Amino acid sequence: MTNITVLEQLMQSFLSEYTFSNRDYFQIKSEPPKFDPDIILSKTFQNKYGICMDLNYAFSHVLKKHGFNCYLVKAFEKKSDGQFYDIYHLTIIVIINGCKYLADVGFGKYFSKPVILKNGVTVDKIRVEVPNMKNNENIYNILSHNKFIVQIKDSPLLSISDINDNYQNFFKAGPYDLPLCRKPYDRIYDQKVGDYIIPQKVEK
């Protein structure tokens, strides 16, 4: 079955088993790793942690194995000056009965359920807004408690080379290039409390 209930169950299961972690950024001192799909899947499923590009790529693989129609897309966070960071967030859009849902397991906070991508809809404190765009791009602004989180560009990302460039740019980035490069961050979703927590034991 590929319905919203199953999607939510898969999300919650994945989020409670896999830790969002940027620890590799602080541990890898050699050349930045490449985004090789087979290596990423093997590493993520074995180590059970990663950043957005690891986790959401692995989860998209899980979804496809369960028969879901899904694709990867780029999303962008804002700097304090309102401009967008160059390094993008990799996330997932799932199509169920003609409706599009955001299914993000790689943010490390905010998201725990599928969010239907319709203007003005609020799901689990997450609000979707569709800005007035002049270039006919399909854009969704995602907010939490009226605070901007990320802007999604609804265009299937099919190029592994593009993801690889973004992946390597992350590992080359400095503290001023992206907040995630400033300090270690580990979070896992606790279904009992319904929120993200610091893992009791950090995997090595």
Swiss-Prot record:
Q: EC number(s) of the enzyme?
A: 2.3.1.-
Q: Name one Pfam family in it.
A: Acetyltransf_2
Q: Which UniProt keywords apply?
A: Acyltransferase, Transferase
Enzyme class comes to transferase
Q: Which residues form a coiled coil?
A: none
Residues at the active site? C52 (acyl-thioester intermediate), H89, D104
Q: Answer yes or no on keyword Acyltransferase.
A: yes
Q: Which InterPro entries match?
A: Arylamine_N-AcTrfase, Arylamine_NAT_domain_sf, Papain-like_cys_pep_sf
Single annotated GO MF: acetyltransferase activity
Question: Which protein family is named in the record?
Answer: Belongs to the arylamine N-acetyltransferase family.
User: Which protein are we looking at?
Assistant: Uncharacterized acetyltransferase L280
User: What is the scientific name of the source organism?
Assistant: Acanthamoeba polyphaga mimivirus (APMV)
